[in-house]
């Protein structure tokens, strides 16, 4: 028997190479609450760079987390799923007004903005602002092969598709108050030229890629993938210090870029990688400022790599921009304490493995880490149905 307050909103499923994260939300007396939340680690090789290698095992994993999410109980057979960010494209463009329909103009110009032929992609668009002589339009596109693969996956898992989204869309919805319906302007009103936007950069450092999203004036401007990942950082530590991947992961989390931890051994190993990340951010930031104008007001860090100790401080110093760790519960009426059994992770590491017996902390290093920001995409997907209802 279903409880009276069981949610009918779709489940948000964030399926990545290494895990599945699930969130279902409900609206109770005007408050957005978590109905179900959970995480399931995937064995290596089931998914590689977003491509599904072992469909049968992935279907089993989806069914498992649906049946037992960890917190709460799933009460919907609909799901909103995120398409692999590295396989998709999203960008704000400007389209001059003309006698032709906007749909026809965008269809004719889509290949100028997406590095694939029109016949190979599904694409969608929405007007984000109307100016005197042009429209600002957000376009998104994904390869048909990937979309069809994920649609079939959900069908095989006995779930109906509520939505398939490009990851930056879900991330922004999960993190920014500007994405809530009450913050949105009425359907693309005429906007005076020169209106000052509120500009964000969002850096999502995931297990197998990093994504930098630029967000201005209540809409995504563009996103860029970077060839840096949490796994790459862990592997570099493992190779350099001859540690197991598990030991290297703990060293990364506990020591990070803090030069006072283990005498800065891990920071030294990561310096070249972080320089590369800073360089890529600078390239994207220069493009944003030169092509779109404006300056970033704030950078938000999310994803597992966003918790690397001292990373935010280094980025803030490099670009003189305020940097914060993202709060994935921003648009929910929840506090994080009730999810601590899932969010909070304790990591311990023996500094002797670093041949660093002189560490001031002693040999045993440990840290309590909140992994809540890794649920950003799943929360953003789950918010979609609620926000649509509120429009």
PLM feature spans:
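Hydrophobic/aromatic-enriched cytosolic interaction surfaces used to assemble or bind macromolecules
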Residues: 1-391
